[in-house]
């Protein structure tokens, strides 16, 4: 059986980001590969030195994606030693809009921007304050009074935070005559 080795979740200093690893290994063979962090989050929000890298690996049959994984493991790597690990703490800004901040989760709207690929984007900061994985989703979303679902979902590992964007494509906004965004209403669930 050929196995696929992948990273399901990656964190740097408690900030969830995208660690990319997808390596197939044929029966009886070995492979060396690297995990790439393809995420501007680490630079855009000054995460600092990588003092605590959390990785959740999953190994599964390449030819049967519906089969249960043959291995799932999570590890932490402390490049400077575990005693030097630093957890990221985001400082609030005057432009923040706190949507929710309770014992379970925190969601903060940081602002908006236009992205050439994703379209109109609401930038958010989210924290999972629990010891279980949370799925953040949006419901009943409207732009300028027109229903416009961004089809948003973000799975956030226990005790981590992340920066993300909730986006609407140009075509979605054009269909709803909402090229100029004046108001957005939505329910965010975790």
Model region roles, listed by residue range:
Residues 10, 25, 55-57, 136, ...:
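Fold-core signature of tandem repeat domains
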Residues 84-116:
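Low-complexity, acidic Ser/Thr/Pro/Gly-rich terminal tails and inter-domain linkers that flank the onset
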Residues 68-89, 190:
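Short beta-strand elements
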Residues 12, 102, 143-144:
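Structural motif
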Residues 117-123:
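Short, solvent-exposed loop/turn segments enriched in Ser/Thr/Gly
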Residues 9-10, 37, 126, 140-141, ...:
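Hydrophobic beta-strand positions in extracellular immunoglobulin-like domains
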Residues 15-71, 146-189:
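Short, solvent-exposed, Trp/other aromatic-anchored flexible loops in extracytoplasmic proteins
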Residues 1-2, 125-131:
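Asparagine-centered strand-capping/turn motif at beta-strand->loop junctions
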């Amino acid at each position: 059986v050929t196995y696929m080795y992948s990273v399901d979740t990656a964190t740097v200093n408690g900030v969830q980001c995208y660690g990319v690893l997808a390596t197939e290994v044929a029966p009886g063979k070995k492979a060396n590969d690297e995990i790439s962090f393809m995420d501007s989050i680490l630079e855009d929000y000054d995460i600092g030195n990588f003092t605590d890298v959390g990785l959740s690996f999953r190994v599964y049959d390449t030819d049967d994606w519906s089969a249960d994984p043959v291995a799932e493991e999570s590890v932490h790597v402390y490049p400077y030693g575990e005693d030097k690990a630093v957890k990221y703490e985001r400082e609030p800004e005057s432009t923040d809009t706190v949507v929710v901040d309770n014992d379970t989760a925190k969601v903060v709207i940081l602002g908006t921007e236009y992205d050439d690929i994703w379209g109109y984007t609401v930038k958010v900061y989210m924290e999972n304050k629990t010891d279980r994985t949370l799925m953040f989703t949006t419901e009943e979303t409207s732009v300028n009074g027109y229903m416009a679902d961004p089809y948003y979902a973000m799975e956030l590992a226990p005790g981590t935070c992340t920066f993300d964007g909730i986006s609407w494509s140009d075509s979605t906004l054009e269909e709803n005559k909402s090229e100029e965004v004046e108001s957005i209403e939505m329910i965010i669930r975790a």
